[in-house]
Swiss-Prot record:
Molecular function GO labels: DNA binding; DNA-directed RNA polymerase activity; ribonucleoside binding
Reaction equations catalysed: RNA(n) + a ribonucleoside 5'-triphosphate = RNA(n+1) + diphosphate
Subunit structure: The RNAP catalytic core consists of 2 alpha, 1 beta, 1 beta' and 1 omega subunit. When a sigma factor is associated with the core the holoenzyme is formed, which can initiate transcription.
Listed GO biological process terms: DNA-templated transcription
Protein name: DNA-directed RNA polymerase subunit beta
Gene3D superfamilies: 2.40.50.100, 2.40.50.150, 3.90.1100.10, DNA-directed RNA polymerase, beta subunit, external 1 domain (2.30.150.10), DNA-directed RNA polymerase, subunit 2, domain 6 (2.40.270.10), RNA polymerase alpha subunit dimerisation domain (3.90.1800.10), RNA polymerase Rpb2, domain 2 (3.90.1110.10)
CDD domains: RNA_pol_B_RPB2 (cd00653)
Origin: domain of life: Bacteria
Any single GO CC term annotated in Swiss-Prot or TrEMBL for this entry: DNA-directed RNA polymerase complex
Gene encoding the protein: rpoB
EC nos: 2.7.7.6
Function, as annotated: DNA-dependent RNA polymerase catalyzes the transcription of DNA into RNA using the four ribonucleoside triphosphates as substrates.
Record's keyword annotation contains Transcription: yes
Entries under HAMAP family matching the protein: RNApol_bact_RpoB
Amino acid sequence: MLEGCILAVSSQSKSNAITNNSVRGAPNGVSFAKLREPLEVRGLLDVQTDSFEWLVGSRRVRQAAIDRGEENPVGGLEEVLAELSPIEDFSGSMSLSFSDPRFDEVKASVDECKDKDMTYAAPLFVTAEFINNNTGEIKSQTVFMGDFPMMTEKGTFIINGTERVVVSQLVRSPGVYFDETIDKSTEKTLHSVKVIPGRGAWLEFDVDKRDTVGVRIDRKRRQPVTVLLKALGWTNEQIVERFGFSEIMMGTLEKDTTSGTDEALLDIYRKLRPGEPPTKESAQTLLENLFFKEKRYDLARVGRYKVNKKLGLNAGKPITSSTLTEEDVVATIEYLVRLHEGQTSMTVPGGVEFAVESHDIDHFGNRRLRTVGELIQNQIRVRLSRMERVVRERMTTQDVEAITPQTLINIRPVVAAIKEFFGTSQLSQFMDQNNPLSGLTHKRRLSALGPGGLSRERAGLEVRDVHPSHYGRMCPIETPEGPNIGLIGSLSVYARVNPFGFIETPYRKVVEGVVTDQIDYLTADEEDRHVVAQANSPTDENGRFTEDRVMVRKKGGEVEFVSADQVDYMDVSPRQMVSVATAMIPFLEHDDANRALMGANMQRQAVPLVRSEAPLVGTGMELRAAIDAVTWSSHKTGVIEEVSADYITVMADDGTRQSYRLRKFARSNHGTCANQRPIVDAGQRVEAGQVIADGPCTQNGEMALGKNLLVAIMPWEGHNYEDAIILSNRLVEEDVLTSIHIEEHEIDARDTKLGAEEITRVIPKLSDEVLADLDEPRIVRIGAEVRDGEILVGKVTPKGETELTPEERLLRAIFGEKAREVRDTSLKVPHGESGKVIGIRVFSREDDDELPVGVNELVRVYVAQKRKISDGDKLARRHGNKGVIGKILPVEDMPFLPDGTPVDIILNTHGCRVVLNIGQILETHLGWGAKAGWNIDVLAGVPDWASKLPEELYSAPADSTVATPVFDGAQEGELAGLLGSTLPNRDGEVMVNADGKATLFDGRSSGEPFPYPVTVGYMYILKLHHLVDDKIHARSTGPYSMITQQPLGGKAQFGGQRFGEMECWAMQAYGAAYTLQELLTIKSDDTVGRVKVYEAIVKGENIPEPGIPESFKVLLKELQSLCLNVEVLSSDGRAIEMRDGDDEDLERAAANLGINLSRNESASVEDLA
C-alpha cells in the first residue's frame, strides 16, 4: 500500500542520465567536446525526489540503503514514530506505541487539485498499540493521522491549488568544531572547541590567555575543565595519567578547588541553577539529562558520524548511540590541549592516529543539507512531542478499561504542523514557473536562510564567499545579486546528497598514473585527503597521463604540478563545478564571473515565446535540463498507439498501455503560458526515456528560451547608446519575439449581513451594449475580446438599508423585495489590461464543490494577452548583457548584407568590450558558421587548427545546431578556421569574411556601404519578463488618499506621478510661481479648489484662486496634537479659520456637477465612473 502511493515520484527521474548521444530521437547536432565523459548527468530532480522517498520509506530507497551496508533501514516517518514510542504514563503502567506508517491512494489528480484549489495529498495511517502493563492486555488499532501532501513527479507539491517547492537548507552540521583566534591584548593564539548537537545543550571548551582550560555548559559561566572530569567520576590520578603530557592541564588541575566527584557535581549545579539548593542527586540527574539521555540530547546520526570521524573513535563500526559518551568528552579535551600546544597528531586509546588541526566552519565538510524529507520530518517531530504530552495526560484521566488508541490520540498538532510548514515556512516557496529552467533551478536551490540557519543581516563576507570545497558541489557563479548574494546557491550538475546530508561530487580513480573508469563520490573532507587532476589533463588511449608533470589541486584549493603517480583522482567532466543554468552558457570560460552570474540568472527570467527555437550554439546541457524540467518522456519502450493535441498513448512492449495528458494553454504561477505539444506520430517506435512531447520553451526536447537572431555589432545614430537595442520590425510583424501571458481573474458571491450576493446578468444602470459579451449564465463568453473596464462576471450586492421616501415605500409595498436597491460589484478587467477570454471555471455549492465558509459561488476567468515585442521591453543575452529596446526600425531601414539580407538586431560595440564577456563575440561567430554551414578542405591534409576536431566536424550543413560545452568547447583558432570555411549562399558568395566581419549597407535612402566592416553573426536573444506593458501607466483623475487628499501612488492603486521636493526646486529655479502654485493646490490636495476649477472649466469661466491644501490642514492638526496653539494669520494679522471642507458652495457645485465628494481611495478605476 505504501509503494502504491509514492506514485507521484516519477520513475523517469530515476532513470539513468540522458544525453544527446543516448536518447533516440534527440536533435541532430555536432559537438566540439574533446573529452569523453565517463559519467552521464544524473536525474536533476533527485535531490528532491530521493529525499521525499526516504521520508515515506519507499522500497527503492530501502534497497539502496541495504546495498550501502545499512542494517534494517527505516524511512523518515517510521524513524520519528520509533523515537516517540513507547509513550508511558507517569506510573509506567500503560504505554502506547506507533509503527508501520502507510498511505492510501491520493484523493485527486494533480490537475484536479490545481483546478479546485485542493491539496495533492494522501491519507496517512499508522498502527497504534496500547499495552496495559498491569494486566498484559494489548489493544491495536489503525489510526488516521491526517492527509499528507505528496510530491508530484516533477518534485513539487500542490498546496491549496498552488504549486510550491521546498528548498533545501544549507546548515552547520552537528559535530565537534575546533577554532583558533588571536587575543587582542596579548596577541596569543587561543583555541576553543564547541560540541554542537542536533538537539540539546552546547558543550564548549577553551584555553584562555592565562593558559587554563575551561568549560561552558549550556552557555553558562566558565569553570575549570577538571571540574567536569571529576563530575564524570575521574580522580586526580586518572586525570594526571591521561593528561600528564600537558602543562596547561596540570596547571588547571592545581587551580581547581574541588576535591571529588560530589563537590564537582554541586559546583556545576550551582553554575547551571543559581539560587536553587544543590543536592548530589539533583546534580547527577541534571548532568545526565543534559548530555547522556536520548530524550533530552541528540547528536543525530550525522553528529555522531562527525564526532567519530574527527576524534578517531569507533572507526568502521556502525553508528548506534546518539548521545555523548565519557570518551567523547575526554578525547575532545585532549584534542584541544594538543592543538593549543602545537602538536600535529594524537592517538586515541583504540590505537588510531590522526591529524590535529583547527576547522574551517565554512568548509563543506562542516556544512550539510537539510533536504525536503528531513525538513518535514523535523516539523512533525516537534508536533508529535506535543501530542505525547496530551496522550500522557489522557492516560491518567481516562478509565483504563475504556481506553483505546483512538481515544488517546489527538491528530490536530500533526495536521497543523504539516499545514504550517507548507503554508508559512520560509523554505516552502511559491514555485518559480516563469520558464522551465527557472522551475528546475528552484528545485535545486540551496539556501543558508530559514529557521535554524543564517539571517542576511548577520551573515558576514566569509560565509558568502566562494570556498574551495564548493568545487563540484555548489556553483560558484549562480547566486542572487542583492542582499542574499552567497547565501543562496545552486547545486552543481553532477552533485548528489549522501544519507548524512553532505554534498558529494564524482571523481575518476587514478591508479599509478593511469585513469580508470571507476567512479567514486567524495565529500569535501574526503577530497581534502587526495590529490585531484582536472578533467582536461592530457591522457593517451590507455588513460595514462602523457605529461610528466600534471596540474592538480590539493587541500585548501592549492594548485601545483606533481608527477603523474602522485595523482589520486581526476574530475569526471569540465562542467562539474557549475550549475545547470551556468552550464547552458556557451564559451563561459571567456566571460567575466560577474557577467556570467547575470547571464545564469537572466535565463530564468526569459518568457516562453509563441514559437520556441533551440539555440544554434548550445552547450549540450539543453536536452537533459528540458527532460527534467518540462517535457514528457516515455517511461517504457514501445509504440505510439494514439496521438492528439491533448494526450499521447504508448503501448509498451510488455503489453501495458500508458497515457500522457498534455497541458494546453495553462497559466503558470507567473502568468506565462504553459502549453505542451506532441512531437511523435502514431505508429512511431519510442525508447524508454525518449522525449514524446515538447513543453513551453522547448523544441524537439531541447531547452529553447529565446531566438537565434542575425546581429550586427555597431553604433547606429545613437539609438543604441549604452545598452539600448535596435530591432527590426520583422520581429514584430512575424511574431518572432511574441509571448502569450495569461491572467486569472476571480470573484465570489458571499453571504453578507444585508443578504446574499448574486452573480447575474441583470445589473442596474448598465446598457445592453455593455453586457453584450455576457452569456445567459451571467459570465463573459469564451473567445470574447475584452479591454480594461469591461465586465467579465456580473454581480450585484445588496445595499445598506436607509430610511425610505414615501414613494419608495409605495414601490416596496407594490413590488415587494424586487424594488430593493443593489450595488454593482461586477468583476471587471483591471486598468491597463486586455486580451481574449480563453477559459472559465465555475464552482458552486449546488454542485458540491468545496468552497470557503460563507462563499456560495466562485468564478474564475482566464484572459490571454498576446504581447508583441515593443519599445521599452527588455532583452538579454546568455552572457549577462541586458538592454532595453530603444527603437524598432522598418525592415527597409535596417543595415543589410551584400545579398540583401537585413539584420534583425543592432547592438552597441561598448556592450561587448567594456564588460569583459568576449564569449558573446565567439558565440556570434560560431552562430554564423552553424547557420551557413561549413566544409573544411582536408584533401591536402587536416589543417593544424582542425587537428583536435572530431571527424564529424569537418563539415556541417546549413542550419546545424552545435554544442560547445563549458571549458571543453570550440577554441578561438578553430572558430577562425571555420569562418574561413563557411559555405557560400545561393549566389555562390560568402557573406562573412574569415575575421567574422562583413560589409554592411545602409538600408536608408543612400544604400551606401558603411565605411568599415562590421561583426555579423547569429546570437541567442532572450525576451525577459520585464515588459513595458506591465510598467507603463498614466492617470488623469483617480482616487485620493483619505488623510492628505493627495492622489495615491503606483500603478496598482491607479495613482499619479509624484511631484516631489526636487521637482519643486526645479520650478522655483525657473521662477514658475503660478505653475508651482497650481501643482501644489488644485492639481493635488486643494479639495475645494478642485471642484471649483472643474465647475469653471465646465462653465467656461476663469480659473478661480486656489485655496488651502489639505496637507497644510493635516500639518496644523499634527502640531495641535502636540499641544501647540498654532494659528494662521492673514497679511493684516487677523486669524484665518481653517474649515474642514463644509463649504456650502462646494457642496452645491459638486451636486450640480454630479461629483461624489465622499469618494476616497476607490478600489478600481470603474469606481470613478
